[in-house]
Amino acid sequence: MQFSTTPTLEGQTIVEYCGVVTGEAILGANIFRDFFAGIRDIVGGRSGAYEKELRKAREIAFEELGSQARALGADAVVGIDIDYETVGQNGSMLMVSVSGTAVKTRR
């Protein structure tokens, strides 16, 4: 499965548009990691705990996106948009949402 943020894939022709596909992942952030991440952010360091959670959520969202595309018989997803949000009480959860158009291609 190929993923692209662009509307086309270089060297390939889109032969069929299968439909819009989406993938979402919402992960709760551990309160102790949140506390220490906040301290590191204050002193200018990077928050490895948040980065790890965002990476995990993004991977899950892309897996879901690919599964939906495969179910439609697609071999690629183009025009992908990736959104990151904090949700829940006091932003206690991380959400990654990806969407795009599932397509069938030919070289």
Swiss-Prot record:
SUPFAM superfamilies: YbjQ-like. GO terms for cellular component: plasma membrane. Transmembrane segments: none annotated. It holds the Pfam family YbjQ_1. NCBIfam families: PRK02877.1. Belongs to the UPF0145 family. This is UPF0145 protein YbjQ. It comes from Escherichia coli (strain K12).
